[in-house]
Amino acid sequence: MKSSQTRKNKRSNNKTRKHKTLKPYKGDTIIMFKPNRKAIEIANQDVVKYLFREKVNVDKAIKQHQGFKQILKQQGQKFVDISEYIAKDTPSEQLANLLYTRDPFIRTPKGLVLGNMKEPARKHDREIIEAIMKKFHQPIIYKCNEDEKLEGGDYLINCNTSFLGTGARSNMNAAKKLLKLGLYGTEKVVIIFPVKPEESMYRIHLDCIFSPFGCKQCVIWDDLTHKNSIHKRMAIEYTLQNNGTYKRSCKAKNFIDYLKDNNYNIITLSSQSQHNYGANILELDNGKVLVQDVETHKKIKGSIFVPFHEIHKMYGGLHCSTNSFVS
């Protein structure tokens, strides 16, 4: 069977490659950044400028983040707090949003791609993260150009499929550049876009409304399942070819239809759950799923609840607050 398939592949560059199913990044290190007291105190003076929903109780935020770390320890999950690796002369105001380590870069099976933050309040995040990645000897395979907006909360990976959301923070320029350069490293790439501009801070990134876990399981905001929703997302699939390039493999379709067509087990979440970052789940190396919302906790069997409501005031959740690199 294998030799026959190989011969068939050699005869046509238009046929897709066959790959082993990619598993989540097992045995790697989660990177985190504990809430910085001085930075949050500065941000509390102008919550709009620093992208907060409202003023944050620093002590509560630090306590909840510490509780998050404790759960990671209990689950045997490796992690590192990068706060001790920050240059000491870094201005505190540049650290207000760095707690959300997810956004400055994405990690694909090919390596680390440094993004390009859209909001001025986060323009320093990339250079700070880049310096830290160098300290950990992590190679950067690409840095997005100025016209290529890319934030890590818009990138998700599951079962050899990359999902990249575009819209409020990441754009098509970045999505297509990674396609052109072959940097996704998965058999399929699904680029997702809204039918109407989306600016709500509750939905700025893909991981705020959708997250896959396990293999072909996912949680998704219920509103996205309605065909006439003004928040509807569309999806275009690209498939890896024998020559290493990606070719569009389907017409744009409703994202929820794409998930159904690809046999995803779909768990829908209410708007209240979505506002509580119910879709912003974090899957650990051991397969356990961490959640921060009661509804999601009930719907994902065996999930672990992590109190995180104070940090939600900064417009982010558990997945937003982590990223990873090769140990």
Regions found by a protein language model. Give the residues of each.
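Arg/Lys-rich, intrinsically disordered low-complexity tails that mediate electrostatic binding
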Residues: M1-R17, T21
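The feature marks the mature, well-folded catalytic cores of soluble enzymes
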Residues: K15-S327
